[in-house]
């Protein structure tokens, strides 16, 4: 797993309190990992802080899964 994926997974596990093995590429933050809309906003803010990037609102709405987050951050970094 890439450094970006490892760091994203750590953030997801810490913020959502889920088991690390539940965080798969296709895992939906809401449907599979139990996040609500506030959780997803907090995740985006944590990603921005961790990676020193800005995620515009329209882009944030497209980040629905762990894989989406890794792909977006990898391309933005």
Curated annotation (Swiss-Prot):
Post-translational events: 4'-phosphopantetheine is transferred from CoA to a specific serine of apo-ACP by AcpS. This modification is essential for activity because fatty acids are bound in thioester linkage to the sulfhydryl of the prosthetic group.
Modified sites of kind O-(pantetheine 4'-phosphoryl)serine: 37
Main location: cytoplasm
A GO molecular-function descriptor: acyl binding
Keyword Cytoplasm assigned: yes
Any Gene Ontology CC annotation: cytosol
Subcellular location, record wording: Cytoplasm
Domain Carrier: 2-77
Pfam families linked to this entry: PP-binding
Keyword Plastid on entry: no
Record key words, sorted: Cytoplasm, Fatty acid biosynthesis, Fatty acid metabolism, Lipid biosynthesis, Lipid metabolism, Phosphopantetheine, Phosphoprotein
Superkingdom field: Bacteria
Functional pathway: Lipid metabolism; fatty acid biosynthesis
Free-text function comment from the UniProt entry: Carrier of the growing fatty acid chain in fatty acid biosynthesis.
UniProt similarity note: Belongs to the acyl carrier protein (ACP) family.
Protein known as: Acyl carrier protein
UniProt source species: Ruegeria sp. (strain TM1040) (Silicibacter sp.)
């Amino acid at each position: 797993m890439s450094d970006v994926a490892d760091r994203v997974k750590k953030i997801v596990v810490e913020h959502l309190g889920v088991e690390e093995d539940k965080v798969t590429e296709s895992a939906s933050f809401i449907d599979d990992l139990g996040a609500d809309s506030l959780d997803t906003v907090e995740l985006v803010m944590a990603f921005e802080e961790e990676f020193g990037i800005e995620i515009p609102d329209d882009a944030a709405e497209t980040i629905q899964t762990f894989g989406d987050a890794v792909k977006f951050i990898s391309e933005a970094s």
